[in-house]
Amino acid sequence: RDDFGIRGIALSWTLRNTGTEEVEKVAREWAVESRESRTVEGVHPFSPALLGAPSGSIIAIRAQTTDWRKDAEPVFSRVIQAEIVSIEAHAELIRARMEDLLSRLSEIARLEENVLIETLKLEAMDPDKAAEESSKRKAEETAEKQEDLAKQLGSMGKEGMENLRQAMKNPVFEEQTLKEWSETMQAMEELSEGKMQEASQQLSQASSSSSQSERNENLSEAENTEREILEEIQSLQGEINERLDDLEATTLAQRLRRIKRTEDDLGESLAKNL
């Protein structure tokens, strides 16, 4: 945006980290005829392959604009740096991110077990102790812990889906593999929005129950729901473990193929020089 009217904009790029001289090149320019234009937008596709950007290099992109003032100097945007990675490195990055999700899911399982233990302790209280205000607060705190775990798991499911959207850009990953992963991430989100929320509500209701029998009923329901949650988390862990093994095999095979291509290229180069 320029209050003096935009005269033109340009998009430029610089290839870095290649061991050669860095030269900024203009990718595209847009001229603006009207002096009244205060805001201008431009779209230009970028292809690392067409730019000759090898794996490990960086493409630095920035825009510039000039207005209609006499002798106006161009104004530059901030530089956006795009790191170029090979499909093998990208596949390994996706695999590592999903492996991190499994590690965090194990922590969710541990904390869910703690919630179940707290629920069992609340159930085991004698009526006099259960009627105390401190016990009611404890039930509400446990409900809040359950709610927090639900939010964490839901966030992890969304993160996993974003990883899969990135994986769709990589030809290494087969459509069926991505579909199976998507189903697992969706199950994770459904668990966070369903039974985990349900358990939190049951615990909260137990904290505000007007009678001992109502409290016991809510706690019993919460216990059953929490046990079901743990079973589903364990099932998710098994699915993710199995799919990580498949991803490991896929990325390893891709790396071996790349090594073979490199060896073949070196062999051809040596043969030409002999």
PLM features: what roles do these ranges have?
Residues R1-L274:
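Extracytoplasmic/secretory ectodomains and luminal regions
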